[in-house]
Amino acid sequence: MGYQEKKQIVLDELEKSLGAVKEEEVEQFVDMICDAQQVFVVGVGRVLLMLQAFAKRLNHLGIKANYVGAIDEPAITEHDVLVVGSGSGESVVPLEIMKIAKKYNAKIVHIGSNEHSSMKEYEDLFVRIPC
């Protein structure tokens, strides 16, 4: 299988996944980010790597973004948004971070695939990416 065939497989997968994401959830997510004073991201493993890249891109756009656990991480406030990436919605560390952020009245966005997870009671918005 050559490059073009492999490329098409990847593009088809992306189209299938992103085509199932609800536009109104993404629009609300964007609005929450734009309205926040700061954006924080948390996840585990590969999800965390992608969220760190996302935070970097937000900073390039002039939106102050941090990842939880960074040495220079500021405090979260009620004016901020926490973006949690967890497909299962059961990742222990992100779930505990959500609980803390909720105590500070931060807005919480959960990006994942399981809409009936333990994170449900803490999220203000769930953006489902089916897999």
Describe the role of every protein-language-model region.
Residues 18-35:
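A short, well-structured juxtamembrane/interface segment
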Residues 1-20:
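Generic N-terminal amphipathic, Lys/Arg-enriched alpha-helix
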Residues 4-5, 29-30, 72-74:
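Short, flexible segments with low predicted structural confidence
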